[in-house]
């Protein structure tokens, strides 16, 4: 069965926040996933990472793989904003740690990305510290999905992509656990689109061709960031 919200925030303690940038030149943003109610650096949440396609510019995955822990919230943005978002995330975590009496000398911010250059002037690097802080301030259990935050500039199956989320509740013995997922979708050719088990892509492609829509011939390329969260008692190797 699905969780109460059918979202990653059905996992206890997880929050999601967005900041969306929509201007004449830029259609982009940032999404933050806060893994729990406590200081992530102090708690070092059990974590793992998996790279399906290595043509990406994500930050922080190497240490997650090495140590099996997550010590910051996760941020998603566009490709050329990874550095600026990393810097903002580091600053926010340092502030949180100092407020909790900690003085970190090394921090591993985790930032994922998709390239949204098709509808966003990505070279402008429109996401900075202000936008990251706004995303943190907006973090909640009841977050928006679709054309928001890091999904503002993404394209999926030749149509508008965005942020999506879902959850499932499973039973092991007499105890219930929740698995939640959040995606930033930016991939796929229209002809391969399947909705609720039905291959609707070819029909959409035919309609686009009738309308002389040039986007109908897009190649199957792009990327997707997938963030999974769970309250299952697993090790980093089991998560992998």
Annotate each language-model stretch with its function.
Residues 1-240:
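A structural signal for small-residue-enriched, beta-sheet-centric alpha/beta enzyme cores
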